[in-house]
Amino acid sequence: MSTRLSVLDQSPVPEGSTPGDALRNTVDLARRCEAMGYHRYWVAEHHGMTGLAGSSPEALIGSIAGATRRLRVGSGGVMLTHYAPLKVAESFCVL
């Protein structure tokens, strides 16, 4: 039995970088994880935090899925109280 490795990436914004840089770093890290044989890649949703760029997991999941081939990508959490449940379900079904 082999161990399946996963990553939970909160898209941190390093000092001196922009949120755009952080999101590009997230996609790059996902590619590297896939190349190293990781099984899953999780992203998180955060709002109003200058040190974290992941405010739209459904958009970020689409970017990561488009940049990788075998990596299973998902959201480690969605702030459901901010959205209509049907809209969340529809957004993730499209992915």
Place the predicted regions along the sequence by residue.
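The substrate-binding groove and active-site-proximal loops of carbohydrate-active enzymes
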Residues: G74-H82
